[in-house]
């Protein structure tokens, strides 16, 4: 181990930065955040330093570096573009046994600055020992995606509960299980972020008083349209905390590869016109797993509340008293249109968007007259098998036969395929495509030739 990672208490302690430019400013922000009593020495300063000094946040010493500035310091940073000066600051600090960081010169420094993930009071520091700062930054970005934004507030709140938890739970095992539940409780994190004292109290009492081994929950997560990069940050966090993941055919393999490795996976394989597992059975799977005390993620393609039957599944849970939450996803209409170069709205062509199910059930006739109106974009989900009927009905109700249309297959995936034409060709075009596909109808489709970016990558 080349460096010992430590966390320094700098509040109200004297620290020195030599340098008055942009790099020095970045270092100053960190020391100010840590509560240091900061002095900055340079021949000239960028405006931010002057603003901080005017606000009484730090002291500026304009002029050449003088070693006496180090006399009361606990820590120093040399952040100038003058290598000789940086070396001089480092040597002066070394002679006084003061730790000194030298920017971009780790060999001349007695400590290095890590990449920091701040979820105060939780702090994570990542360092490559100065050999590869870019790698450290990339690792920090990865870790940022895994740590919920409100985790720091939950950690701080946990500190306030320690005494009560110790009284409530007799064994270390019970306390550990309680803390595990608390730190993954999404409702508590959101309540703390909103400073909702009533919800904080209710959730805390529920967590403390419920049986530790018999309380499960379900999180309904939208997986997005296909590309794993379009899964939301919160969605990623949920699938990596799950005990059980119940998922559909429309959830891509790339996204399933992100699921926690030891989570149970239950495939319910829903597809247009055919359900491998009946909806009622899916509802019962969610209920049964949650009643075992497990954290269940119901993972759905797109957004779970847009033609995903998410509401039906949650009603079952609600009736059984199972706690649940929802993480929205990028719906297929948004993802497929963006990756096909088709804006859903445009000032010149469409002032509204209609999202329509292509399951045209008997007795559930659509309002074709309104759908055939100009200045809007129609997006049909699961409409491939009904494309000829959609074409016929829209033309019968006045939509021009030359209206541009597009069908997007496997939208946002590397296997995405798009075919376009006119409304009079829709039924014929649909025969060339496979599910899952989305039908887009409107003048905005005409912009595809100009705005199509994804097929060029």
Curated annotation (Swiss-Prot):
The keyword Acyltransferase does not apply. It holds the Pfam family Sirohm_synth_M. The keyword DNA repair does not apply. Pathway: Cofactor biosynthesis; adenosylcobalamin biosynthesis; precorrin-2 from uroporphyrinogen III: step 1/1; Cofactor biosynthesis; adenosylcobalamin biosynthesis; sirohydrochlorin from precorrin-2: step 1/1; Porphyrin-containing compound metabolism; siroheme biosynthesis; precorrin-2 from uroporphyrinogen III: step 1/1; Porphyrin-containing compound metabolism; siroheme biosynthesis; siroheme from sirohydrochlorin: step 1/1. Residues 216-457 are annotated as: Uroporphyrinogen-III C-methyltransferase. The modification Phosphoserine is found at residue 128. The active site is at residues 248, 270. Its EC number is 2.1.1.107, 1.3.1.76, 4.99.1.4. Signal peptide: none annotated. It comes from the Bacteria. S-adenosyl-L-methionine binds at residues 225, 301-303, 306, 331-332, 382, 411. One of its GO terms (molecular function) is NAD binding. Residues 1-204 are annotated as: Precorrin-2 dehydrogenase /sirohydrochlorin ferrochelatase. Keywords: Cobalamin biosynthesis, Lyase, Methyltransferase, Multifunctional enzyme, NAD, Oxidoreductase, Phosphoprotein, Porphyrin biosynthesis, S-adenosyl-L-methionine, Transferase. One of its GO terms (biological process) is siroheme biosynthetic process. PANTHER family: SIROHEME SYNTHASE (PTHR45790:SF1), SIROHEME SYNTHASE-RELATED (PTHR45790). Then it catalyzes the NAD-dependent ring dehydrogenation of precorrin-2 to yield sirohydrochlorin. Finally, it catalyzes the ferrochelation of sirohydrochlorin to yield siroheme. HAMAP family: Siroheme_synth (MF_01646). In the N-terminal section; belongs to the precorrin-2 dehydrogenase / sirohydrochlorin ferrochelatase family. In the C-terminal section; belongs to the precorrin methyltransferase family. This is Siroheme synthase. It comes from Escherichia coli O7:K1 (strain IAI39 / ExPEC). The lineage of its organism: Bacteria, Pseudomonadati, Pseudomonadota, Gammaproteobacteria, Enterobacterales.
